[in-house]
């Protein structure tokens, strides 16, 4: 039987209520649970263990994806890795069985609840859409598409022809796949973190693996407090 770990990212300035609720839901599966706590201006890497529940305190670098990457590298001997933002909640108790089934298919590289429909297009199409607005990096204007592709190239990831990607709300990957892609890139700011989110799916496809949404509809097994069930827009802007 494969050995799995649930890794939850949490920002210490937020209320712990969602985190506590998610931990309670995940405990029924009897797997190891790790909460990676992002803390501003923190200089240590500190682990606290309580049976199957551990807390890893770290500097807030790379936001959720940075926390997930740290968790995988710290707990590197599991077969399957399930990553969650603390705002996630389980909608279907069969989620673990479904995800393990999908992870057992060798061609499947990454599993999640929501492939971003607004970005499920070619880069050429994206460059013509209003979503490709200008941002400022180092006080210099640049279009989002150009910047995200540039960051991927900096990270030695081929952007490919498509911007298709799984939202970094929850992901599941095997240890074999994580080693193949060498974990996740770490963004230094919000825009770099968006680039990191897209680049993980791009690297999965670069390795000839598939990006898998767990069901035809969004958020069938795992919901998120910020997102509507159709996956098109947030319920509220933070």
Enumerate the predicted regions with their spans:
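Acidic ATP/Mg2+-coordinating residue in the GHKL
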Residues: 37-40
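Conserved catalytic core of nucleotide-sugar-dependent glycosyltransferases
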Residues: 90-188
């Amino acid at each position: 039987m494969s050995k799995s770990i649930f890794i939850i990212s949490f920002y210490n300035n937020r209320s712990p209520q969602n985190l506590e609720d998610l931990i309670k839901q995940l405990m029924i599966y009897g797997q190891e649970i790790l909460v990676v706590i992002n803390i501003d201006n923190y200089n240590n890497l500190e682990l606290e263990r309580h049976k199957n529940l551990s807390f890893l305190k770290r500097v807030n670098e790379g936001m959720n994806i940075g926390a997930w990457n740290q968790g995988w590298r710290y707990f590197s001997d599991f077969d399957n890795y399930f990553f969650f933002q603390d705002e996630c909640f389980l909608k279907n108790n069969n989620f673990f069985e479904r995800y393990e089934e999908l992870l057992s298919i060798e061609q499947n590289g990454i599993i999640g609840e929501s492939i971003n429909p607004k970005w499920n297009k070619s880069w050429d199409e994206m460059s013509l859409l209003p979503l490709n607005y200008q941002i400022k990096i180092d006080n210099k204007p640049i279009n989002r598409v150009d910047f995200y592709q540039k960051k991927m190239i900096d990270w030695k990831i081929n952007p490919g022809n498509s911007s298709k990607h799984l939202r970094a709300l929850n992901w599941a990957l095997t240890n074999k796949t994580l080693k193949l892609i060498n974990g996740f890139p770490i963004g230094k700011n919000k825009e770099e973190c968006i680039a990191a989110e897209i680049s993980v799916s791009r690297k999965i496809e670069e390795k000839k693996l598939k990006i898998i949404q767990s069901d035809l509809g969004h958020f069938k097994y795992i919901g998120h407090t910020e997102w509507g069930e159709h996956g098109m827009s947030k319920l509220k802007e933070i």
